[in-house]
């Protein structure tokens, strides 16, 4: 997984190692089969495979699974720009579901729009991928908080 250039500068020189370690400690992402596809300062891409246990009653991937994927991508994009010794928590998000969740796998892309010292505004996109073709199925705006509190360190 190659990182690409980013306009953002991380505040922690070990941001990538810290991000990968934090991701590995997330049981929900393991349950959903989510993997890190790309990690750059201020931008993260995660992938989730189609699986029967994440479907809703009509055979589409449940909106909750898509939301978890994109929220996590946004959170890790924000975390990549946070100082060492801090953690990230979502304080608000809005998800627009534009198309049913149909595809072989789903990509969640989180991007930091405004990297504040205590609050970061992010944009998330969810793509359904089938045979290499991508379709935008959902958009998220999310606000992430930089948490400097014992027990909440990523």
Predicted regions, residues:
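Hydrophobic beta-strand-centered segment that forms part of the acyl-chain substrate-binding groove
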Residues: 61, 76-107, 112
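Residue-level recognition of specific faces of alpha-helices
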Residues: 66, 87-89, 94-97, 118, ...
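Hydrophobic residues in beta-strands and at strand termini
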Residues: 48-50, 97, 146
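Hot-dog-fold acyl-thioester-processing enzymes
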Residues: 24, 49-73
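Non-catalytic linker/capping segments at the edges of enzyme domains
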Residues: 1-47
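HotDog/MaoC-like acyl-thioester-processing domains
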Residues: 2-3, 8-13, 100-154
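A generic structural signal for short beta-strands and their flanking turns/coil linkers
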Residues: 30-32, 42-44, 87-93, 104-106, ...
């Amino acid at each position: 997984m190659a990182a690409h250039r980013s306009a953002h500068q991380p505040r922690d020189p070990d941001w990538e190692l810290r991000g990968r370690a934090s991701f590995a400690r997330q049981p929900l992402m393991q349950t959903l089969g989510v993997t890190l596809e790309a990690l750059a300062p201020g931008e993260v891409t995660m992938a989730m495979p189609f699986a029967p246990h994440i479907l809703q009653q009509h055979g589409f991937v449940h909106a909750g699974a898509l939301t978890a994927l994109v929220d996590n991508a946004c959170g890790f994009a924000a975390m990549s720009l946070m100082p060492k010794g801090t953690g990230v928590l979502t304080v608000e998000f809005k998800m627009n579901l534009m198309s049913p969740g149909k595809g072989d796998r789903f990509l969640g892309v989180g991007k930091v729009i405004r990297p504040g010292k205590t609050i970061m505004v992010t944009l998330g996109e969810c793509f359904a991928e089938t045979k290499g073709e991508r379709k935008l199925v959902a958009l998220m705006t999310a606000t992430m908080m930089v948490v400097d509190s014992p027990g909440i360190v990523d």
